[in-house]
Amino acid sequence: MITPFDLHGALNLDAARSLARWLQDQGNDGLVIAGTTGEAPVLTDDERLSLFAAVIEAVTIPVIAGTGTNDTAHSVHLTKEAAALGAAGVLAVCPYYNRPSQAGIEGHMRAMAAASDLPVMVYDIPVRSGRKISSALLLKLAREVSNVVALKDAAGNPGETAVVIANAPDGFEVYSGDDGLTLPLLASGIVGTVGVATHWTAPDHQEMFGLWDAGDTAGARRVNARIDRKS
């Protein structure tokens, strides 16, 4: 979900509540806040936590709070705060700018997961973070850390996504994090999308997923083409 600001650059919580309710009414099954689209790196802690509280209060669908930063201790703190506010889960982005090793990424993700009992969605977006989370590490976290339960995949490599899905433990869910790859990734077994276009195409996405699940791949392609025209 985008983060609304007013003309003076201040966080607009009334607009955030209204937008969250509208997105729910449009058919979104959950909301991810303070992610990439929500401009998380520009938010102060007070703004981020106020946003969490406002959106959680405004809707009845699950709210996934973006608590990952490039600072492990800071990410742990935000995760604990999100849990106290009632978030349904947290989004843990690969630490950006620092370009950590795979061992460093592992330590960061384990620390975030240990900070609360909330489900953790790992967020792999190398074009912005500067570091790809390896498929081997994604699978290791999925197998060894009980509350690492999902992946938002914005890595742009459908072949690697297919490897993760094929080898992940039962119950581990993979979501598209790239609007342009959502339909192709359905063929590999993703369960949904954490999108940008879903701000205005949620009914279309619901229709596309329904057609795909029903075996109507041609129909799903037609709806995807409609989504592309709107994006």
Over which residues does each language-model region extend?
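Active-site beta->alpha loop and helix N-cap motifs at the rims of alpha/beta catalytic domains
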Residues: 3-132, 140, 148
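Catalytic cores of alpha/beta
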Residues: 71-84, 161-164, 180-188
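Catalytic beta/alpha-barrel core
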Residues: 90-91, 146-156, 172-178
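Acidic/histidine-rich catalytic cores of soluble enzymes
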Residues: 123-124, 141-145, 152-158, 167
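Short acidic/histidine-rich active-site segments
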Residues: 176-178, 191-197
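Active-site pocket-lining segment
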Residues: 199-206
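Short helix-adjacent coil turns
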Residues: 212-219
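Conserved small/polar residues in nucleotide/adenosyl-binding loops
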Residues: 230-231
